[in-house]
Amino acid sequence: MNSIAPRLEIEQFICRSDNYGVLIHDPQSALTASIDAPDAAAIEAALKRRGWTLDFIFTTHHHLDHVEGNEALKAKYGVSIIGPKAEETKIPGIDRTVKDGDEFTFGLFRVKVIATPGHTAGEVSYYLPDAKAVFTGDTLFALGCGRLFEGTPLTMFQSLQKLVALPGDTAVYCGHEYTESNARFALTIDPANSALKERAAEIARLRAADRMTLPSSIALEMATNPFLRWHDAGIRSRLGLQDAPDEAVFAEIRKRKDMF
């Protein structure tokens, strides 16, 4: 007897100025979750557009532009808010805490929690292996990574190592539409990368048409994102770090991005 893999429906939209709102929906159980809650009104509009109701919020980290809609959405829909244990006191309305290695179910889908600190001390990513998708908050961006507000370069490097270990065909959904500016920086670090140059041109076309640049994929990020290319000989040579540890190469790239 053949089994049919479950299908996850994903509704992605830009809200606030550059935040991504992301709703995930399991049609068989009719459950819907919001990845973070940047803007309650925008999320409500997306739910109405799709004819869904909201059951969960999966919080990646405590920053206001990711949790500001929590209380309004909880009041309207009675949602259960899940978020990182390490940031429990900073997440409005939180009902359930999770930590690295935890696993829970969302309808027919397994959700694996990956601790990805660096941007904040307790940030987590949510990986749905059956849907081949990972939701990385402000840890991994398209062609970038999050600023280190509460972590060190080594902390973020170790978090990114966890994400690049996922299958290459895993779709990547992140918290912000920063891709065009990230591409400009990436080209200063890896100017000979033909895949990056092609991607940067495509990103420019998409943004000129006011279209979204996500989702990406783990494979695409590994091929073009300088923050994941600490091993590349050309990048190392350009930075003067030919023999440096991988984490030192990453730290130098992050330092340069902070000054870009």
Swiss-Prot record:
Keyword entries, A-Z: Hydrolase, Metal-binding, Zinc
GO molecular function, a single term: metal ion binding
Record-linked Pfam families: HAGH_C, Lactamase_B
Catalysis: reaction(s): an S-(2-hydroxyacyl)glutathione + H2O = a 2-hydroxy carboxylate + glutathione + H(+)
Function: Thiolesterase that catalyzes the hydrolysis of S-D-lactoyl-glutathione to form glutathione and D-lactic acid.
Family classification: Belongs to the metallo-beta-lactamase superfamily. Glyoxalase II family.
Name of this protein: Hydroxyacylglutathione hydrolase
